[in-house]
Amino acid sequence: MRGSTESLCGTVPTDAAAERLVQSLIDVAGEDQVRTVLLFGSRLVQASPDRFSAYDFVLVVENYRAFYDALVRAGLSRRLPALQAVLNRLLAPNVVAFAPEGWNDVPVAKVMVLEPAALARALSRHAPDHFLKGRLVQRVALLHARDGAAVDWVTGLVTDARNDILRWAGPFLGESFTPAEVALRMLQVSYRGEVRPEAGDRVLDVFESQQPFLSDMLTCVLADAADAGELRLAGGNYQFVRAPSSRQRWSVRLYFARSKLRATARWLKHVVTFENWLDYIAYKVERRMGTRVEITTWERRLPYLLLWPKVVRVLRERPASSRTGAPR
């Protein structure tokens, strides 16, 4: 794919806080454990971040249990390492909080933890769901790689995932389309594949914050597809040489239905894996929706049993889009 390495390694703004967090991860886990660290999300693309926004990392470690043991030894986790490792294998990735300097007005990272094989599977054509693929085909930055082989490895995975966009976004495209239209549709489809406590027009914020990158990246993807004979140019727009079949459409819809179920299961798992998850998500709901959520002592003790009414209320009160093109 044209320009793939630049999309991971080039023109990343210096962020001292992110660098401190990455170095802390390496110090805690050990250089031999940390293969790569990727940054994505609002802190990278500047999609409505504020000083409370966590850094979104994808951390690739060589062994789950060794990593979680290291967090406990450093006093950065109170979770059982054995349980964390089991959950990570059952439904990757785990999402953990990493707050080496505390929680008050200092940098905090929200870390997706994967072993190498799990990341490779999550970004492949045979991914069990869209959770990681939908995020990492967007703009990402490679903050750390153990060596040159690690750079080549992760760059290849992300490049292959981007080259696969037309397979799962294609069934939702019109008869003809531009790179920018594919980029927006890709984000809309990805966001619909999850349960998110945000207004529908959040997808437009994400699109606009990284439109130059997405348009350039999709220009490369579509040009490669045209070279391969999958697309043709017609009046400045692209068209499929052979439109996605009904079978392909149903296969993709089934994939996203399964992905949404697995995403919902991850929300339940986050309560176990993520320190202060309930406070974090309550703040996120307030920041994105303007709805204050108070969590009682008993709801903290029995979240799976007692929090459902508030979850339903938040989803029901989620504001509809007020902007054209952002689906609910």
What is each residue range found by the language model?
Residues 58-60:
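Short hydrophobic/aromatic beta-strand micro-patches
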Residues 1-32, 38, 44-51, 63-328:
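Catalytic core of pol beta-like nucleotidyltransferases
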